[in-house]
Structure formats: structure tokens, C-alpha cells
């Protein structure tokens, strides 16, 4: 096997260098992966969206901009624009690197029979809720839980869906529409088909320690370490008079624990 598949760390002094490295390595690997008839699975994780730093020569698309994420400057009153523009500049570089991969796939005619997914594992907050939250992993509001999800399927026409979906929906979609599984998604997943417009009420979001249920209009029912449930609206404002229908809550708890 290639040393690329054996290494535990990607070489490079900066986040950008390492993202460029995995792109270069993958473009070279495609010459082998795409040369035969065997199916292959590939995963590229671009870290610029997490590292949020670039050299000065890359900070030209969005201004004014910081050169790095200076978290010590952040508070509830600071103008987020320079920090947000730094993030935009980083994402523009990720977009460019992903474009190189797509171009290579096109050149090798692999887009004719390859599913391509571009997504993220979480959102990124820049104090949009005006409660001094920055980054991710600190609340379950839309700005931290909404993510892009682009699915390219060469066998289907382009379409934009505007109903609520979750990452849980991808596996049932893949199993049903690509792999030919006929069992209902409820047998193995909390998700639905991505094209299914049914309600996603009571879908689960979580981090390493806690979790929450998201219901109507992104109402957040967050389990606290004490076992209590804290209820807030999409802007993290407490909802004191919200009534929980335990007939709906209990089955969701049971499914989450399975």
C-alpha cells in the first residue's frame, strides 16, 4: 500500500499546507483508483474551516479581515465582520481545492458514475444570536447546526430541496436509491429519504456529552447534565410556558437510547 494510506499525520506547516497536501495526494491517487472497474470510496476532510488562518497573500477576496482567529478579542459587542471575512477567505480556498478534485473527476470521466457529496459536520457561529457564542459545539441554534449538503448523482437531474433534512437521511437514501435495499429506513436508521418532505420533528442533535431534540420552528429541547430539559427558541431565548407532549417525547427518548 502507498505510504499515503499508512501515515498518521499529514505533512505541512500550516492548515492550508496540509489541505493542499491531501488534495495533491488524492489527485495522484485518482490515477490509480479511477483506472479500473472496481468501485472505490474516498473521504477528504478540509481543516481550513476549523483552523481559520491564512497567509497574507491569500487574504484578498474578503476585506477587512483578520489574519488569524484572535479569540481573546471576542466579546458580545465586537464587530464580527473581520473575523467572518477571514472565515470566508478560508472557505474560498477550500472551494478552490474541492474544485480541483471535481475537475480531475471530470477529466477522468468519473463523474459519469460517481456520487459526490460536499457537506460539513456543523455550522459556525459569529455571534448571530447576540449571546457571545462563537464557533461551534456551544449551542444547538440554527447557525451552529445548519450545514450545506450538496449531493451529486449522475443519474438524476439537478434540484434544490428546501424542506428540513438531517445527516441521518443520507444513509437511508444511499441504501434505498443506490444499493437497492428494500427494508424500510426505520429498520436501521432515524433518518428518511432526503427527498421525503415528511416532518423531521424530534430529530436529535448532539455533541460529545449532551444532546437535544429539535421540534417545530427549531424549538430546542436540550437535555442538561442534571437530567432536566431546557427549552428555548431558535435564538436561544428561554420558552417558559412551552408544553411538552410526553406521548411524543417518550418514544423519541426510547429510539435515541437504542
What are these regions (language model features)?
Residues 2, 48-56, 61, 124-128, ...:
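Short catalytic/ligand-binding loop motif for oxyanion handling, primarily in non-cytosolic enzymes
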Residues 2-70, 191:
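Active-site-proximal alpha/beta segments of enzymes that process anionic O-linked groups
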Residues 6-9, 72-83, 150-156:
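Short glycine/proline-rich turn/loop motifs
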Residues 17, 81-94, 137-145, 156-172, ...:
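A short beta-strand-to-alpha-helix junction
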Residues 20-35, 67-114:
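A long, amphipathic alpha-helix that forms part
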Residues 39-47, 91-94, 98-101, 114-123, ...:
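Beta-strand elements within well-structured catalytic alpha/beta cores of enzymes
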Residues 58, 106-154:
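Histidine-centered active-site microenvironments of extracellular/periplasmic hydrolases
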Residues 106-109, 153-258:
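Membrane-interface soluble catalytic domains
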Amino acid at each position: 500500500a502507498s505510504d499515503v494510506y499508512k501515515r498518521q499525520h499529514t505533512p505541512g506547516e500550516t492548515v492550508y499546507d496540509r489541505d493542499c497536501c491531501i488534495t495533491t495526494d488524492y489527485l495522484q491517487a485518482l490515477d490509480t483508483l479511477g483506472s479500473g472497474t472496481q468501485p472505490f470510496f474516498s473521504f477528504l476532510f478540509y481543516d481550513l474551516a476549523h483552523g481559520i488562518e491564512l497567509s497574507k497573500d491569500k487574504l484578498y477576496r474578503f476585506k477587512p479581515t483578520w489574519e488569524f482567529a484572535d479569540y481573546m478579542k471576542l466579546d458580545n459587542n465586537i464587530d464580527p465582520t473581520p473575523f467572518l471575512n477571514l472565515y470566508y477567505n478560508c472557505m474560498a480556498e477550500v472551494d478552490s481545492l474541492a474544485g480541483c478534485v471535481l475537475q480531475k473527476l471530470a477529466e477522468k470521466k468519473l463523474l459519469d458514475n460517481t456520487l459526490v457529496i460536499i457537506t460539513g459536520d456543523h455550522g459556525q457561529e459569529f455571534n448571530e444570536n447576540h449571546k457571545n457564542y462563537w464557533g461551534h459545539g456551544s449551542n444547538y441554534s440554527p447557525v451552529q447546526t445548519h450545514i450545506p449538503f450538496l449531493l451529486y448523482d449522475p443519474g438524476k437531474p439537478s434540484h434544490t430541496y428546501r424542506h428540513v433534512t438531517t445527516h441521518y437521511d443520507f444513509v437511508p437514501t444511499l441504501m434505498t436509491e443506490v444499493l437497492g435495499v428494500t427494508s424500510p429506513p426505520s429498520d436501521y436508521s432515524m433518518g428518511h429519504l432526503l427527498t421525503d418532505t415528511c416532518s423531521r420533528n424530534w430529530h436529535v442533535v448532539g455533541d460529545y456529552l449532551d444532546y437535544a431534540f429539535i421540534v417545530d420552528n427549531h424549538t430546542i429541547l436540550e437535555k442538561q447534565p442534571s437530567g432536566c430539559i431546557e427549552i428555548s427558541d431558535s435564538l436561544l431565548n428561554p420558552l417558559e410556558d412551552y408544553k411538552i407532549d410526553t406521548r411524543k417525547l417518550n418514544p423519541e427518548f426510547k429510539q435515541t437510547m437504542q
